[in-house]
Amino acid sequence: MSTKVPIYLKRGSRKGKKEKLRDLLSSDMISPPLGDFRHTIHIGSGGGDDMFGDISFLQGKFHLLPGTAVEEAEEDGSFDLPFQFTRTTTVCGRELPDGLSPLLKNAISLPVIGGPQALTLPTAQAPPKPPRLHLESPQPSPQPSPQGAGNVDVWRIPEAGSPHNGMSPEPEAEEPFLSHASSLLSLHVDLGPSILDDVLQIMDHDLGRVQIPT
């Protein structure tokens, strides 16, 4: 707000006319930007027990705070001040030295990410693993111990056509993949006797019409 213009509302010159908002307000009532303005200090009615921020402007004159006056009144036995309540003192459990300015006297700091206090936070449990698909290759079985070497069962993953009854011991070794190669090579296609006869009759009929030049 400009310091040269006094604070007042514009009044209309005509009597009985309804005043509009644009006539009551003026641009002189709007203050210019104040820049980076932040709430960096707070001193409550408790004085020294109810303050935080940079109070170095006091220059060591902490007896001017209302909290110290309340303490002196309690020692004297007289309570003349209207505000007699005080807040709790520091929550960190240690007192600041007298030579330093009490910055953030009763503020609570949040744990730093990755710090020692963050390790005590509860961690979310990992989701359960999905069931293993049948197309995956079976994992190699662990080596049996010498004590249980006498009774060793070979386990395999059931195929898609087999009933889903879990893992079952394999009595024999798996057959090789090329065992049915011979049956695939000996595949014969039978078109049926009726189709073959019709094809042969058409071929013979066409050959009979063809005239061989002499």
Curated annotation (Swiss-Prot):
Cellular compartments annotated: Endomembrane system; Cytoplasm, Cytoskeleton
InterPro entries associated with the record: Cdc42_effect-like, Cdc42_Effector_BORG/CEP, Cdc42_effector_prot_2, CRIB_dom
Membrane topology label: Peripheral membrane protein
Record PTM N-acetylserine, positions in chain: S2
Gene Ontology cellular component annotations, sorted alphabetically: cytosol; endomembrane system; microtubule cytoskeleton; phagocytic vesicle; plasma membrane
Keyword Acetylation: yes
Modified residues (Phosphoserine): S31, S101, S137, S141, S145
Keyword rRNA processing: no
Keywords of the record: Acetylation, Cell shape, Cytoplasm, Cytoskeleton, Membrane, Phosphoprotein
Pfam families assigned to the protein according to its UniProt record, in alphabetical order: BORG_CEP, PBD
Record-annotated CRIB domain positions: 30-44
Top-rank taxon: Eukaryota
Domain notes: The CRIB domain mediates interaction with CDC42.
Family statement drawn from the similarity comment of this UniProt entry: Belongs to the BORG/CEP family.
Quaternary context: Interacts with CDC42 and RHOQ in a GTP-dependent manner, and with SEPT7.
Protein name per the record: Cdc42 effector protein 2
Organism, as annotated: Mus musculus
